[in-house]
Amino acid sequence: MSSKSQLTYSARAQSHPNPLARKLFQVAEEKKSNVTVSADVTTTKELLDLADRLGPYIAVIKTHIDILSDFSQETIDGLNALAQKHNFLIFEDRKFIDIGNTVQKQYHNGTLRISEWAHIINCSVLPGEGIVQALAQTAQATDFPYGSERGLLILAEMTSKGSLATGSYTSASVDIARKYPSFVLGFVSTRSLGEVESTEAPAQGEDFVVFTTGVNLSSKGDKLGQQYQTPQSAIGRGADFIISGRGIYAAADPVEAAKQYQQQGWEAYLARVGAQ
């Protein structure tokens, strides 16, 4: 685990070179939450209702915007308003995976207009470094209106059974991330990647943020190969933010479930940094 994982969120916010990462840690510290809820619902009404009800207890809401049957300006305006109201960030789990020219258009234009409302996006590096270069180029262009309010997570590992995102692919994810520190926030991975072999030397003060998916208190997996872990095990392996979907939104009482994940995630974080 990276030595940065032993620092508090507030300490990392003060020293982090990436402005969006600083904002992310500030939100976590202010709300005492490292929870990302994966709101995998299929209508704008359901999405905005969940965001409003769960907003006080989460640091980030993660969307799969292309599963909405009625995406519109109402979706964008509603998400942005609720992010302001409840002080959370929006992560669109688009998993960009195409040539650079295509992903630039998917991100900043296109039907979903992702750059307008998603603070955080993610991508696979299967297409090579060009995908990250292209997204960074778009976000850092002089005429890009959102500037430092946008950032990228590289999908370095997955929690599904039989995932091929391992070994040299994960190492390449670290290599590429180190070339774009002003845009790449960190990784979606099952652990801290500080010890992964890399051909790129780490920069002084390097502090990649780790989001870990598949966190569930009531299940160990599903019939489609998803493998779950607890907040304690995820944070113990280096996660800075835990992602839970069905464990929260499909619970009998999603608000109470969100509170439970918030409490357990925060207690696991305090144990990791040695706080009382």
UniProtKB/Swiss-Prot annotation:
GO terms assigned for molecular function? orotidine-5'-phosphate decarboxylase activity
Q: Which gene encodes it?
A: pyrG
Its Enzyme Commission number? Answer: 4.1.1.23
Task: Classify the source by domain of life.
Answer: Eukaryota
- Mind telling me which CDD domains this protein's record contains? OMP_decarboxylase_like
Question: What residues sit in the active site?
Answer: K95
Q: Which reaction does it catalyse?
A: orotidine 5'-phosphate + H(+) = UMP + CO2
Annotated residues for binding of substrate: 40, 62-64, 93-102, 228, 246
Protein family according to the UniProt entry? Belongs to the OMP decarboxylase family.
Family matches, as InterPro entries: Aldolase_TIM, OMPdecase, OMPdecase_AS, OMPdeCOase_dom, RibuloseP-bd_barrel
A Gene Ontology BP annotation from the UniProt entry: 'de novo' UMP biosynthetic process
Protein name per Swiss-Prot or TrEMBL? Orotidine 5'-phosphate decarboxylase
Give the species this sequence originates from.
Answer: Penicillium camembertii
Q: Which GO terms describe its cellular component?
A: cytosol
